Amino acid sequence: MLLKNCRIIKDNKIIEGDILIDENGRIKKIAKDIKVDDEIIDIKNSLVIPGVIDAHVHFRWGEEKKEDFLSGSLAGINGGVCFAIDMPNNKPPITTKELFYKKLEDCKKDSKINVFLNFGVTENNYLGTVEDAKAYKIFMVKSVGDLFIEDYSKLKDILNQNKLFCIHAEHKDVINENLKKYQLNSWIDHCKIRDEKSEVEAVKEVIKNLKIIDRQSNKKPHVHFCHISTKEALYLIKKVRQELKNIKITVEVTPHHIYLNKDMAEELKGFGKFNPPLREKDDNIALIKGIVNKDVDIIASDHAPHLLEDKLKNVKNCPSGIPGIETIVPLTLNLVNKGLISLFDAIRVLSKNPAKIFNINNKIEEGNLANLTIIDLKKEGKINAELFKSKAKFSPFDGWEVKGFPIYTVINGTLYEAYGCKC
């Protein structure tokens, strides 16, 4: 297959040329005016970027009514996503090797995109290693079963390892105190209970332990903070990054924490209920600035599908989480078209940095498997949840006019139409 008339993003430059993909799905040649007797796809000067990596998804293994590896991966293709990293808070949680490899087997059998798995850290299993785990996930607040670090005094020992840890940073004690003050009667109450302080104090707790490890240990953990949502937490992480010598810290944010805020809580209802919750407008602005000044390393969707009937329930019975793998690319490109970030910022947080952090090869180079996201930066259209391939056909962004869409997704050399071809 020959991709004709490409504008290829490589090393912060745009290169014009063609991409020839061989029968094994590998990039055989990148050059101008390639002549070949093969299938030719004229992509008409669209941009070809290294395959987008969504480093935070929940494909709901064990809860197939909500999503499964097939539907989740088809949603990824539709959204221009070539790689995804699935979280371990399943039912049952992925806290043993046996469950990990059972889940991995199902993933390899059913997924149409490249999916990796994180392993769940508990107070009892933290010294174990799982060779095929992409990272180790720590929940600082109640999750599923024993997938939760309840005793924060154990964090130092847990983090004192040469591992990549992904941390859900919400402080259990702050949330428990807030539960004494607030009743969950309105959508804004969800934001009050899991308030900004809960994230900030959790980040402080992790930082305190990392400083001790940095001073006293020769271990070099890498801590990746998932879905940071507040300007204060972002500032604390920026500050400590400059102080630590042997420890790497990276930061992830989501499109919903960039675009949505508390002012929208009552209007969005269940479609605005997720963890961490809606924040302030100032936090939206801080996250965008964080992308530009590189305090934010990646954007991930935290794709968390639920049954629509459950998301339409009242605030007490509505589960937290929204689908996002099909909107992550257009919402990020929309920031480019609004002049809030550059095209190269977008590629850095969607492709380049996730590849570095999680050791994923998505480079557009001869000999590599062709995992490519092809985008039309100028295409305008509406986000239409009815066109989603996810089982969760709803979104807080449904009906939003945005500019910039994925039009094709190439997975290991196979080309698929993406959402931008349909909207």
From Swiss-Prot:
Upper taxonomic lineage: Archaea, Methanobacteriati, Methanobacteriota, Methanomada group, Methanococci
Family per record: Belongs to the metallo-dependent hydrolases superfamily. DHOase family. Class I DHOase subfamily.
Cofactor(s) of this protein: Zn(2+)
HAMAP family, per the entry: PyrC_classI_A (MF_00220_A)
Gene behind the chain: pyrC
Organism: Methanocaldococcus jannaschii (strain ATCC 43067 / DSM 2661 / JAL-1 / JCM 10045 / NBRC 100440) (Methanococcus jannaschii)
Full protein name: Dihydroorotase
Top-level taxon of the source organism: Archaea
CDD domains listed in its UniProt record: DHOase_IIb (cd01318)
List of catalytic residues: 302
Keyword vocabulary terms for this entry: Hydrolase, Metal-binding, Pyrimidine biosynthesis, Zinc
A GO molecular function held by the record: dihydroorotase activity
